[in-house]
Amino acid sequence: MKVNLMLKRGLATATATASSAPPKIKVGVLLSRIPIIKSELNELEKKYYEYQSELEKRLMWTFPAYFYFKKGTVAEHKFLSLQKGPISKKNGIWFPRGIPDIKHGRERSTKQEVKLSDDSTVAFSNNQKEQSKDDVNRPVIPNDRITEADRSNDMKSLERQLSRTLYLLVKDKSGTWKFPNFDLSDESKPLHVHAENELKLLSGDQIYTWSVSATPIGVLQDERNRTAEFIVKSHILAGKFDLVASKNDAFEDFAWLTKGEISEYVPKDYFNKTEFLLADN
C-alpha cells in the first residue's frame, strides 16, 4: 500500500515537471510589401471626386484673356470668335435653370470652357511627337496598373498586385505554407534583430528590410509541440527575396500573396490565428 502511494506521487511529480517546462521559443516574420499605387475607386468615390472636380472648375477664376491677347489685335478677335458666349438676361423670358449671372462674359453658375484655335492644337500635337524623354514638358503617360507579373501570374514577383499589400510565405519540406519562422539560437539578441539576421541568411544580402517595432505583434502557441512563435512585423524596402539553396535546409519554395490568397494556401486553423494581423487592402 505504501509502495503504491509512493509510485503515484512519483508519477504526479514527473507529470507536473514535464508540464511546467518552458516552451521552445521561435521567431516568425510577417514581411510585407506595402501598396505601391492607390487602389481603384468604387462608384461612390468616382462620383464624389467628379463632383468635387466640377465644383472646383465652376468656382475657379475667369480665364484672363486680356493677359494673353492684346485688345484690338487679330489674335484676340480670333480667340473671341471661337468662344461660345453665355446667354444674357432678357426681359419676358423664363429661364428654367435660373436667371443668368454673367460677370466678365462668363456664366458664373457653370464652369468655363475655353476653346483654342486649330492651329494651336496642331502645333501642340506636333511638339508632343518631337519631344524627347528628357524633356520636362513632355506629356505624362501613366503606366498600366496591370503588370507583366499579373499577366503571367508570377507569385514570386514583387511587381504583382501593386495596389494590394503582399506578404511573404514559405513552404517547408512537408509542403505546408506559412510565414517564415526560425529557432531562437541566440537569446542575447532581441527578437527583431534575430529575425532580420535569419531572414538575410535565408535570402542573402540582396534584401533590405525594416522592422516596424521591437515588440512582437502576436504569438502562435503550439501546445502539442510545446513551442511559442513570436511574430515580428517588418517591411521590405528594397531588393528582392530569393531562397539561397546553400544556406537553406528548411524551406523549398516561397510566394508573395495577398490576404485573400493566403487563406487559400495556409491551413484553415493557421489562417484563423493570423488573419487579424493582415491588411485588407
Curated annotation (Swiss-Prot):
<comment type="function">
    <text>Component of the mitochondrial ribosome (mitoribosome), a dedicated translation machinery responsible for the synthesis of mitochondrial genome-encoded proteins, including at least some of the essential transmembrane subunits of the mitochondrial respiratory chain. The mitoribosomes are attached to the mitochondrial inner membrane and translation products are cotranslationally integrated into the membrane.</text>
</comment>
<feature type="compositionally biased region" description="Basic and acidic residues">
    <location>
        <begin position="106"/>
        <end position="118"/>
    </location>
</feature>
<comment type="subunit">
    <text>Component of the mitochondrial large ribosomal subunit (mt-LSU). Mature yeast 74S mitochondrial ribosomes consist of a small (37S) and a large (54S) subunit. The 37S small subunit contains a 15S ribosomal RNA (15S mt-rRNA) and 34 different proteins. The 54S large subunit contains a 21S rRNA (21S mt-rRNA) and 46 different proteins.</text>
</comment>
<dbReference type="InterPro" id="IPR021757">
    <property type="entry name" value="Ribosomal_mL46_N"/>
</dbReference>
<dbReference type="GO" id="GO:0005762">
    <property type="term" value="C:mitochondrial large ribosomal subunit"/>
</dbReference>
<keyword id="KW-0687">Ribonucleoprotein</keyword>
<dbReference type="InterPro" id="IPR033650">
    <property type="entry name" value="Ribosomal_mL46_NUDIX"/>
</dbReference>
<dbReference type="GO" id="GO:0005739">
    <property type="term" value="C:mitochondrion"/>
</dbReference>
<keyword id="KW-0689">Ribosomal protein</keyword>
<feature type="transit peptide" description="Mitochondrion">
    <location>
        <begin position="1"/>
        <end position="19"/>
    </location>
</feature>
<dbReference type="GO" id="GO:0005743">
    <property type="term" value="C:mitochondrial inner membrane"/>
</dbReference>
<dbReference type="GO" id="GO:0032543">
    <property type="term" value="P:mitochondrial translation"/>
</dbReference>
<feature type="compositionally biased region" description="Polar residues">
    <location>
        <begin position="119"/>
        <end position="129"/>
    </location>
</feature>
<dbReference type="GO" id="GO:0003735">
    <property type="term" value="F:structural constituent of ribosome"/>
</dbReference>
<keyword id="KW-0496">Mitochondrion</keyword>
<dbReference type="InterPro" id="IPR040008">
    <property type="entry name" value="Ribosomal_mL46"/>
</dbReference>
<dbReference type="Pfam" id="PF11788">
    <property type="entry name" value="MRP-L46"/>
</dbReference>
<comment type="similarity">
    <text>Belongs to the mitochondrion-specific ribosomal protein mL46 family.</text>
</comment>
<keyword id="KW-0809">Transit peptide</keyword>
<feature type="region of interest" description="Disordered">
    <location>
        <begin position="106"/>
        <end position="141"/>
    </location>
</feature>
<protein>
    <recommendedName>
        <fullName>Large ribosomal subunit protein mL46</fullName>
    </recommendedName>
</protein>
